Amino acid sequence: MPIRHCIVHLIDKKPDGSPAVLHARDTELGASDAIENLLADLNDSYNAKQGKAWGFFHGESGAYPLSGWLKQYLEQEKDFAAFSRVAVEHLQKLMEESNLSTGGHILFAHYQQGMTDYLAIALLHHSEGVAVNAELDVTPSRHLDLGQLHLAARINLSEWKNNQNSKQYISFIKGKNGKKVSDYFRDFIGCQEGVDGPGETRTLLKAFSDFVESEDLPEEAAREKTQTLVDYATTQTKLGEPVTLEELSSLIDEDRPKAFYDHIRNKDYGLSPEIPADKRTLNQFRRFTGRAEGLSISFEAHLLGDKVEYDEVAGTLIIKGLPTQLVDQLKRRKD
């Protein structure tokens, strides 16, 4: 993962309305193993975060100036340190206007992954811990806590440059439960939501369920294809990459690589060719399975509490909306 430029600034602020004090670094960080490890760990932590949103820049204006400064940097009108300096000064101003905001170290990193250029911006905090030194004494130790990553964004610079119609070249961490704590950071990035990741993922899973039903697949084949979808989508989220419908279709059915893709297009589900899969929604699609004494049961996890009710005390399942094929067999048996 080549790192083109990287710099860290510090904004000292407590969430009590006190002024935000900026401690800006003048020069970029030099290349080192520590920087590479930091970026790798940051990417892993960011990709694993649930509840991210995707979007695109507001039009450049005084309220949303970051995209203009970023364009100046990419066109070599500003160097990276100068770009990060005006950006962090703007963030400092927004922090002062938000009483709930807390300061920290602000990381700006321009790096390349494959053939794609990204800009990562993250607010990092320290955690207190302990370490054992060379004299075998236990001493206090501070470290960057990437497990508590709450404010961060990643801009796909290549997508922004090459696809003017894209509405998902920015991803950012949303506040939990609709909290407004992170609004100032989204305004700093100047991002408006363009793609509903959870909604798109639910639509994809609905399309897949409809496809499996229309194909009238045996239970084992349906289970294998479901696992293929979940594994592929989960891998893409870990990599920070979108789910590509054509690639997914070819994985689901190697003999008919366009079958699922054509099903989506013919039924007009309204899905984009690439969608940012939502990890939380994917986890709800995993299957529960079990066999015992001639009985085989398998259902998708998201049906629990809806079409499938579990009574733990009685040890029973109540299934609503039985498959038509099963109902017909039961009726014939009764007759």
Curated annotation (Swiss-Prot):
Keywords: Cytoplasm. GO terms for molecular function: double-stranded DNA binding; single-stranded RNA binding. GO terms for cellular component: bacterial nucleoid; cytoplasm. Pfam families: NA37. InterPro entries: Nucleoid_associated_NdpA. It is found in: Cytoplasm, Nucleoid. Belongs to the YejK family. This is Nucleoid-associated protein PputW619_4243.
